[in-house]
Amino acid sequence: MSLFDKKHLVTQADALPGRNTPMPIATLHAVNEHSMTNVPAGMEIAYFAMGCFWGVERLFWQLPGVYSTAAGYAGGYTPNPTYREVCSGQTGHAEAVRIVYDPAVISYEQLLQTFWENHDPTQGMQQGNDHGTQYRSAIYPLTPEQNAAAHASRERFQSAMTAAGDHRPITTEIAHATPFYYAEDEHQQYLHKNPYGYCGIGGIGVCLPPDA
């Protein structure tokens, strides 16, 4: 594979070796000052990838019931990758967001609705003008319940697209969560630190039908 292949996922055998040292990040979330790493009792975690993680993270931190968010890398092979390595296409990772949420306030189903309605899940290894395997659409469930909900929601959204006259197939990857690696601190809450920064996400005008 070419070092700059942007359309095909690297194999585990060809992925970069990475490192053992985790990426240093701030202790507290820049927006709400909650812990960036701890998960309070009763809260749960979700992982989504839907393009450039700057806009995705902001989308989720604004939701009531979301305790914290973090930008990072998921679904790949290279341990503790850097942003530059992920952008090379040689780690297998997608730009992803870790969401810690209170299920008593916001459900996983509501997070899935936000996911489907705010990006284009048909574009394969890109999202809008952002091209590369790191920009693929993906859901990384942590439990059998999350996995079942993710698959069911994909079927409902595909049906809703068809009903709206959009016959493109969904390319969203749904795979059991592998280790999530935090991105460099400069990427955390990027659009809070840089309010006029780039945000490349946007929906296709289709709503996710409710779970029957």
Curated annotation (Swiss-Prot):
Signal peptide: none
EC code: 1.8.4.11
GO molecular function: L-methionine-(S)-S-oxide reductase activity; peptide-methionine (S)-S-oxide reductase activity
Enzyme class: oxidoreductase
Catalytic activity: L-methionyl-[protein] + [thioredoxin]-disulfide + H2O = L-methionyl-(S)-S-oxide-[protein] + [thioredoxin]-dithiol; [thioredoxin]-disulfide + L-methionine + H2O = L-methionine (S)-S-oxide + [thioredoxin]-dithiol
Record-linked InterPro entries: Met_Sox_Rdtase_MsrA_dom, Met_Sox_Rdtase_MsrA_sf, MsrA_MetSO_reductase
Biological process annotations from GO: cellular response to oxidative stress; protein modification process
Job of this protein: Has an important function as a repair enzyme for proteins that have been inactivated by oxidation. Catalyzes the reversible oxidation-reduction of methionine sulfoxide in proteins to methionine.
PANTHER family, sorted: MITOCHONDRIAL PEPTIDE METHIONINE SULFOXIDE REDUCTASE
Protein name per Swiss-Prot or TrEMBL: Peptide methionine sulfoxide reductase MsrA
Native source species: Salmonella typhimurium (strain LT2 / SGSC1412 / ATCC 700720)
Gene assigned in the entry: msrA
